[in-house]
């Protein structure tokens, strides 16, 4: 039985990302490029990852860092959403890529931007969702059980001392 593609498409590698890995021009959509770049990370195809960055990114200068990121133990890809950009030569793909490190599983979430230039799709940049700010555990308590010292930061979040704000 043929090996399934690392990108999670439920197709064989030969009928999925290998087509892109053999020739960048075979990539038709931003999602296909994103999936093939993920598979290249899994398979250690540094050249493919470098060559599918937009030329303005100067990825060749970052080859060593790219090679290090490929060394992670990538284990799963989930495509959350693929959407068109502001024109036919721009697209976005939001995804979760899971990897194992030091016995723990981590998830990298990104919204990648792709541009099409001279008939080829390229990865140009991405944004990462901001982490939720840690909530003050005192906010989960009832008001009657809340113990706030006069010099503690105010529970309203103003940054002032409790005694000079709500105390």
Swiss-Prot record:
Segments traversing the membrane: none
Gene3D superfamilies to which the protein is assigned, alphabetical: 3.10.450.50
Pfam families named in the record: SEC-C (PF02810), YchJ_M-like (PF17775)
Superkingdom of source: Bacteria
Family under the similarity heading: Belongs to the UPF0225 family.
Record HAMAP family: UPF0225
The protein, known as: UPF0225 protein VV1358
UniProt source species: Vibrio vulnificus (strain YJ016)
């Amino acid at each position: 039985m043929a090996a399934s593609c690392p990108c999670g498409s439920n197709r064989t590698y030969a009928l999925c990302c290998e087509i892109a890995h053999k020739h960048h021009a075979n990539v038709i959509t931003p999602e296909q490029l994103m999936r093939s770049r993920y598979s290249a990370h899994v398979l250690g195809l540094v050249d493919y990852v470098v060559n599918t960055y937009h030329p303005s990114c100067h990825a060749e200068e970052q080859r060593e860092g790219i090679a290090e990121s490929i060394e992670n133990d990538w284990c799963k890809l989930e495509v959350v959403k693929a959407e068109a950009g502001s024109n036919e030569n721009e697209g976005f793909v939001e995804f979760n890529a899971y990897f194992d490190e030091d016995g723990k599983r981590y998830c990298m979430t990104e919204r990648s931007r792709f541009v099409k230039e001279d008939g080829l799709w390229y990865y140009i940049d991405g944004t990462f969702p901001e982490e939720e700010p840690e909530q003050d555990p005192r906010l989960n308590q009832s008001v009657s059980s809340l113990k706030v010292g006069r010099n503690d930061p105010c529970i309203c979040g103003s940054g002032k001392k409790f005694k000079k704000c709500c105390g």
